[in-house]
Amino acid sequence: MYHKKYLKDKHSEWKFYLYTSWLINILLEFRNMYKQVSNSIEISVTPEYLAEQSIPEEYYHVWAYHVTIENLGVKPVTLKSRYWEIIDSNGKKQEVEGKGVIGKQPTIKPGDRFTYTSGTPLNSTSGIMSGSYKMESEDGNQFLAKIPSFSLDLPLPTKKLN
C-alpha cells in the first residue's frame, strides 16, 4: 500500500512531466517561426521540410511554408499580390510574382488573420526565401508588407538507438 504523501508526490511529478512535455512541444513548434511587422501587418512564417515529397538522390528537396498574416491596423486590408525571392545554397536565384496567394485575394479585417500553406522545391539542400505582399486599404492606398527572410534547411538527422 502506498502512503498518501507518496501518491501526492507521484501526482505532482506526473503533472510536472506533462507540463514540461507540453512546453517543449510548443517551443519546438515555434523554434523555426520567423516574424516581421511592417505597416501594421504582422507576417509569421514557419518552414517545413517535406521528406515524403523530396528525392534527395536526385537533388530534389521540397519545403512547405505556413504563413499567417495578421492585420494589426484599424482598417481592413486586401492582399493584392505577392513577390518572393528564393535563393538556393548553390546561389541560384528565382523570383516569383503573382496575384494574391493560393488563388485568393483575401480581405483581412482589423485584428483578424489569414493563414495559408504553400511550398517550393529546391535543387539543393538549403536555401533562403524573402519577399513582400502588396496590400491595399479600403481607401485604395497600396503599400508593401514585408515577409521575413527565412531559411529552408534539411532537418537534423536523427540517431537510431536500436
Indicate residue ranges for each PLM-predicted region.
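Low-complexity, acidic Ser/Thr/Pro/Gly-rich terminal tails and inter-domain linkers that flank the onset
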Residues: 33-59
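Hydrophobic core residues within well-ordered beta-strands of beta-rich domains
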Residues: 41, 61-63, 67, 114, ...
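Short, solvent-exposed beta-strand/turn "edge" segments of beta-rich domains on protein surfaces
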Residues: 51-61, 74-75, 107-109, 122-124
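Asparagine-centered strand-capping/turn motif at beta-strand->loop junctions
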Residues: 69-73
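Short acidic, flexible loop segments centered on an aromatic residue
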Residues: 76-94
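Intrinsically disordered, low-complexity Pro/Gly/Ser/Thr-rich segments with frequent PxxP/GP/PP motifs
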Residues: 96-124
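Terminal connector regions
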Residues: 123-162
